[in-house]
Design a protein with these regions (language model features):
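Internal alpha/beta scaffold segment
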Residues: 1-67
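Basic, gly/Ser/Thr/Pro-rich low-complexity segments located predominantly at protein N termini
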Residues: 11-16, 50, 70, 80, ...
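N-terminal processing/targeting junctions
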Residues: 28-34, 67-74, 119, 189, ...
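Alpha-helix boundary/capping detector
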Residues: 55-59, 75, 239
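Dual-mode signal for accessory low-complexity, basic/Gly-rich regions
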Residues: 82-269
Length: 269
């Protein structure tokens, strides 16, 4: 904004240009900027949070990035178990969560082949909260007597039917988060990350957005987040990179979660 106290953002990405409405996105970003000026400071802590889809994509991509079978088998990841075992077959998140890759899905189409020349296929990583497979490259698959996992790199997460408006209406006190940036790993064994909210963070009181708030730093894991689900909306394709460029094909829903951990305030706009 002109006074330097507020900012807004909206974005969309799709292979079909008819699915993108630039005027609607521009109006949404402008509205967020105007309503985010002169934000108030709030106490850091654990909050109920309504995450817009882009914020969800910012975090869920780190679960997908941690699905490396070799790192799990060697004891270096969240998906590791003692004795060189891994978490395939274990429930790790809410049973409403399914995460898959499908290079032939028109909403999240990916490459027909991998970097090492394998034809890609539909791969279900997490189904009803349970780890179904990990990402095996050619070498690690051969070493373990398995077929390599050639997924094409896209991410699609299951959703629900609750709108963002209804998530807000059902929230006594919480926050609405548009998206994140400056996302950095803290502990890969728990997929713990830190980062900052940006471009529209708002206080929810008694089912209504009441005030803009200063941006906050979080320290939390998308795994913890997906274990604290209260509601999910309809998935949509998002620009999940920090810069807002299309990047990886990701389709995720808006979600409402409890007890998301914010640790400090930021003066960043």
């Amino acid at each position: 904004t002109e006074d330097g106290t507020g900012s807004g953002w909206a974005g969309a990405t799709h292979y079909d240009w008819s699915r993108i409405d630039p005027s609607k996105l521009g109006a949404r970003a402008t509205q967020k900027a105007r309503t985010s000026v002169h934000p108030m400071a709030i106490e850091p802590g654990r909050y109920t949070v309504v995450f817009e889809p882009t914020a969800v994509g910012n975090l869920v991509q780190f679960i997908a990035g941690a699905l490396n079978a070799r790192a799990a088998d060697e004891g270096r990841s969240f998906f590791s178990l003692p004795g060189g075992k891994n978490k395939i077959g274990q429930k790790i998140v809410d049973e409403r969560v399914t995460i898959l890759s499908d290079p032939f899905d028109p909403d999240v189409a990916g490459s027909p082949f991998t970097g090492d020349g394998l034809p890609t296929q539909r791969v279900v990583w997490i189904e009803n909260g349970v780890v179904k497979t990990l990402n095996y490259d050619r070498y690690w698959a051969q070493k373990n007597g398995r077929a390599p996992t050639a997924s094409g790199g896209s991410i699609k997460m299951s959703g629900g039917t609750t709108s963002i408006d209804d998530m807000i209406k059902s929230t006594q006190r919480g926050l609405l988060v548009t998206r994140f940036w400056y996302l950095r790993p803290v502990d890969q064994r728990t997929i713990l990350y830190t980062g900052l909210t940006r471009d529209g963070t708002f206080l929810i009181e008694n089912g209504k957005i009441t005030k803009p708030v200063k941006n906050l730093r979080f320290n939390d894991s998308p795994v913890f987040m997906l274990n604290n689900l209260e509601a999910m909306g309809i998935p949509e394709r998002v620009s999940a990179s920090e810069g807002g460029d299309p990047g990886q094909a990701i389709m995720v829903p808006p979600i409402k979660v409890r007890d998301f951990n914010f640790t400090s305030l930021s003066d960043a706009v």
